[in-house]
Every structure is written in C-alpha cells, then in structure tokens.
Regions:
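Short beta-strand/loop motif that positions the catalytic acidic residue
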Residues: 228, 233-236, 240
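Mobile cap/lid helix-loop segments that gate and shape the active-site cleft of serine hydrolases
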Residues: 31, 170, 186-224, 230
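Primarily recognizes the serine-hydrolase "nucleophile elbow" in alpha/beta-hydrolase
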Residues: 122-196, 216
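C-terminal catalytic histidine-bearing segment of alpha/beta-hydrolase fold enzymes
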Residues: 42-44, 100-105, 235, 245-318
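Cap/lid segment of the alpha/beta-hydrolase catalytic domain
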Residues: 64-72, 91-115, 192-201, 276-278
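Short beta-strand element of the alpha/beta-hydrolase
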Residues: 52-61
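N-terminal cap/lid segment of alpha/beta-hydrolase-fold proteins
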Residues: 21-50
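Alpha/beta-hydrolase active-site loop
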Residues: 109-132, 287-290
C-alpha cells in the first residue's frame, strides 16, 4: 500500500469521525422481564440531525454465532452518519462461540430464535419512541443487516405482524415494522439445500431446531414475504464464498412475485464481509454505498411518505 493510499484512508477515518456522534450503548432490556443484559443498542447520531433525519438499525453478521461489530457495525454506522443518516448498532443475541465448537445446546436452551427477532423488535420500538430525543423521523426507521444480520433484517419485516414482545408484557405504542430494509449478502433460506448456510441455520435454530422441518420452513424467508413488506434493498456478489448468492436470488424472486418494491444489485466480484470498508471487497462491490443512498432517497423514502400520507388521510376520515 503506497503513501497516498494510507493518507486517503486516514483522511476518510477523520472525516467519518467528524460526522459521527457515538453515544453510550443502551441496554435495551433494562427494566423488563427479559434477562439479556448483554444486548445493547449504540446510537450514532450525525451532527446537526433534524426531525427529518432517517434512522437505520444496523445488524452485523456472524453466522448467528458471533458479531462483526467493527466492520459491519461501527464502520457502517460512521459511514451512514457521513451521509446524514442516524445509525443504531444492535448487538443482538447470538449462539456464541461455545455453540460453534460444541453441542451443549442439545442439553440446554442457550440463545436461539425468537431471541434475535425479539431484540430487533425491541430496538425498533425504542428508536421510534426516542425519535424526539435523537432528532430522527419515526416514520423513516429501517433495518440494515449483513450476512446472518441480513436474515434478521428481512425477518424483522417478514414477521412484523407478530408481537414477539407480548410474552414479556410489552405492548409497544408504536409499530415494530421497519419502514425499509437493506440486506447485504444475506442468509435467506434455511431449507433449500443448494444455498442454505448451515452454520447460520444451526446458530438461530439450535441443535434440535436445525432438524425440525416446520421450524426451518418458518424461517426460510423466501417462503413468507408478506403483502405489506416494506421496500427492500439487496446486494450480493457472484463470487461470495461464504453465503451463496442463490439466497438473494430466492429473495428477489419472492419479492417480485409479491410485487414488493425492491432493488437487487448483483456484483461480479467482492466476496463476503466487506461492510462499508474502503479496503475489503472490490472496487465494484464498494459502490453499494452510493447505490443504497440513491435508493433510499429516491425510492424507499418517497414510498414511505406516500404510505404515511394515505394512512393519515384514512385516520382523518374516521
């Protein structure tokens, strides 16, 4: 790497830091019956944020066993801030390293679904309820996920009508449906043997659940896209060696058949796990960032505003 490239990266880091206002992590389950003190939501609010500022809950990947909070968490949040978008990095529950190297969940429950979806629903609730505090638009709250986090992001839209918080006695006064979703090299299917990412399936379902046909089907997202699914942005690289791009093709097909507004971008090169990095992936795959901002401003948010306007008109007629 030459000196110019070093200087460019250094200046980029300084610029991103200047735009970002990282706040202390929030323990999202404090004061509730849920025992999950390690689940946190870290706000990154751009300087000068206004009430119209969109917000994105960021779900890092890691096969539902661990989380890449540096590249697919903090790095993404700081980049979003540089675009004037508020970000909230979610450290959701995962199976853990011991579940990866052993089979202890044959004997104890451990962490598995619906823990993860419960975490993201709670996060959407808290972000919307705290919109005034963070100077964000509560009607422009999306979820962005990478790899297994992409599965969680799409699941947050797919199962938004199911209140996973109700067993805890939590009745949100706001919607837990995201207004838009971005899925980067996502895990999608848990049933299609051609494309399934087995480690992620084991992470979210557990030792017994990974063999349960009904449970696997229930979280194969391509089979359960709802009619009211919000707009979706998808990116996958053809040379991804970790999660087959067939996952995104299945999702694209399902969204198309349901006539859900979405954009699916296929890159020839880029691999996996590049997040918003300036050095990982390829020059081609790094263009997803500009594509996402354009899609958000020109496609997703206008659709969100139109939907909100129609809902407000219905309320006025009542």
């Amino acid at each position: 790497m030459n000196v110019r490239k070093y200087l460019f990266i250094l200046l980029l880091i300084v610029a991103l830091t200047a735009h970002a206002q990282q706040q202390a992590p929030l323990k999202i389950w404090t004061g509730t019956a849920e025992r999950a003190s390690n689940v946190t939501l870290t706000p990154y609010i751009p300087k000068g944020a206004t009430a119209n500022c969109p917000a994105v809950i960021v779900c890092p990947g890691g096969s539902y066993h661990w989380l890449d909070t540096r590249i697919e968490g903090e790095g993404v949040a700081k980049w979003l801030n540089s675009q004037g978008i508020a970000a909230f990095v979610l450290r959701y529950r995962v199976a853990g390293v011991w579940a990866f190297i052993s089979h202890y969940r044959l004997f104890v429950r451990g962490r598995r679904q619906p823990d993860m979806l419960r975490d993201v629903q709670r996060s959407i609730q808290l972000v919307r309820e705290g919109a005034t505090t963070w100077s964000i638009n509560p009607q422009a709250v999306g979820v962005m996920g990478f790899s297994a986090g992409g599965h969680l992001a799409v699941a947050s839209a797919t199962y938004a009508s199911t209140n996973y918080l109700s067993p805890l006695g939590i009745v949100p006064k706001v919607s837990v449906r995201p207004d838009f979703v971005a899925a980067l090299y996502p895990v999608v299917t848990l049933t299609d043997k051609r494309y399934v990412h087995r480690r992620s399936r084991k992470g979210i379902l557990g030792e017994w659940g990974k063999c349960n046909k009904k449970l696997k089907d229930s979280l194969s997202l391509e089979r359960h896209i709802p009619a009211n699914c919000p707009p979706v942005f998808i990116v996958h690289c053809d040379d991804d060696p970790i999660v087959s791009p067939g996952n995104s093709r299945l999702l694209d097909s399902a969204l198309t058949s349901r006539r859900i507004p979405h954009q699916y971008i296929r890159y020839n090169t880029g691999g996996h796990g590049f997040g918003a990095s300036e050095v990982k992936g390829s020059a081609q795959s790094r263009r997803w960032r500009e594509a996402f901002v354009s899609w958000l401003n020109n496609s997703a948010l206008p659709l969100v505003r139109d939907t909100a306007d129609r809902q407000n008109k219905k309320i006025e007629k009542l």
